[in-house]
UniProtKB/Swiss-Prot annotation:
Natural source organism: Salmonella arizonae (strain ATCC BAA-731 / CDC346-86 / RSK2980)
Cellular compartments annotated: Cytoplasm
Family stated for the protein in its record: Belongs to the radical SAM superfamily. Lipoyl synthase family.
First-listed, main subcellular location of the protein, grouped into a coarse class: cytoplasm
Stored NCBIfam families: lipA, PRK05481.1, PRK12928.1
Residues annotated as binding [4Fe-4S] cluster 1: 68, 73, 79, 308
Key word Phosphoprotein present: no
Protein name in the entry: Lipoyl synthase
Gene: lipA
Pfam families membership: LIAS_N (PF16881), Radical_SAM (PF04055)
Pathway involvement of the protein, from the record: Protein modification; protein lipoylation via endogenous pathway; protein N(6)-(lipoyl)lysine from octanoyl-[acyl-carrier-protein]: step 2/2
Lineage: Bacteria, Pseudomonadati, Pseudomonadota, Gammaproteobacteria, Enterobacterales
Residues binding [4Fe-4S] cluster 2: 94, 98, 101
């Protein structure tokens, strides 16, 4: 029997070390290993990387993190080259260990009390008009990190009064009442929380999370702020069916969610959950049509769509795919 990993505070555990800590083991079959990316999944890198390096330098200067880098997002080059990034607060170590995600797992250090001001200054220096703030899960904090979100929102608005802020929040497991009390006092312009996938395979995809809890979080925020758009997204290609995706979309509408994102799951490493299928652009178009027919005010559905992909355009109701 192998010895359990003793996690040191502040150390990032990735790939095999991270997956070894997950109770539900995922076996990669020969078919999974041979599944190749179709033509529509090939990415063109920009010829000039000057702006990409500039954003990375600004992040490093202030000790900030982007989910684009930490989660190995396939759109990093495109977004950075257009001068946009999704900031990840509360450190770069997550207390969860979801097998689809490339963010490191471990025992995080205490939140940086200066991060809200550093973040606000960086955003002001970049002259951003729309910003997405997300975080790792912080199950070690009594409020799940909600107060830190609120502090960041307050600091950003103080330096950039005209900016629009979207928050992509964790589920605040076991701390919903306290978290919503804080966030209701300092609400963002868009409230986003991702369901990620369908209930049937939740235990494999999101160990430690609960489908109905996440729906309730979205619903309760919407009840408190009916004027603020609520948003959620799924990764597809993890073993779900299109019919199951449609049913999740119905659940989201029943809980007041008005904006939707659907994108193709990509395996960060051979240690993560394998891709079970590649969903075609035509299928994404069909699901978008279904979403709009259900009453979503905006639906971004396509192979490379991620929750914060061109989030400013999504908020304006413009086409994103």
């Amino acid at each position: 029997m192998s010895k359990p990993i003793v996690m040191e505070r502040g150390v990032k555990y990735r790939d095999a070390d991270k997956m070894a800590l997950i109770p539900v083991k995922n076996v990669i079959t020969e078919r999974d290993a041979l599944l190749r990316k179709p033509e529509w999944m090939k990415i063109k890198l920009p010829a000039d990387s000057t702006r990409i390096q500039g954003i990375k330098a600004a992040m490093r200067k202030n000790g900030l993190h982007s989910v684009c880098e930490e989660a190995s997002c396939p759109n990093l080059a495109e977004c950075f080259n257009h001068g946009t990034a999704t900031f990840m607060i509360l450190g770069a170590i997550c207390t969860r260990r979801c097998p689809f995600c490339d963010v490191a797992h471990g025992r995080p250090v205490a939140p940086d009390a200066e991060e809200p001001q550093k973040l606000a200054q960086t955003i002001a220096d970049m002259a951003l008009r729309y910003v997405v703030i997300t975080s790792v899960d912080r199950d070690d904090l009594r409020d799940g990190g909600a107060q830190h979100f609120a502090d960041c929102i307050t600091a950003i608005r103080a330096k950039s009064p005209e900016i629009k802020i979207e928050t992509l929040v964790p589920d605040f497991r076991g701390r919903m009442d306290r978290a919503l009390e804080i966030l209701n006092a300092t609400p963002p312009d868009v409230f986003n929380h991702n369901l990620e996938n369908v209930p049937r395979i939740y235990r494999q995809v999101r160990p430690g999370a609960d489908y109905n809890w996440s729906l309730k979080l979205l619903e309760r925020f919407k009840e408190a702020h009916p004027e603020i758009p609520t948003k959620s997204g799924l990764m597809v290609g993890l073993g779900e069916t299109n019919a199951e995706i449609i049913e999740v979309m119905r659940d989201l509408r029943r809980h007041g969610v008005t904006m939707l994102t659907l994108g193709q799951y990509l395996q960060p490493s051979r240690h993560h959950l394998p891709v079970q299928r590649y969903v075609s652009p035509e299928e994404f178009d069909e699901m978008k049509a279904e979403a709009l027919a259900m009453g979503f005010t905006h639906a971004a559905c396509g192979p490379f769509v991620r929750s914060s992909y061109h989030a400013d355009l999504q908020a304006k109701g413009m086409e994103v795919k």
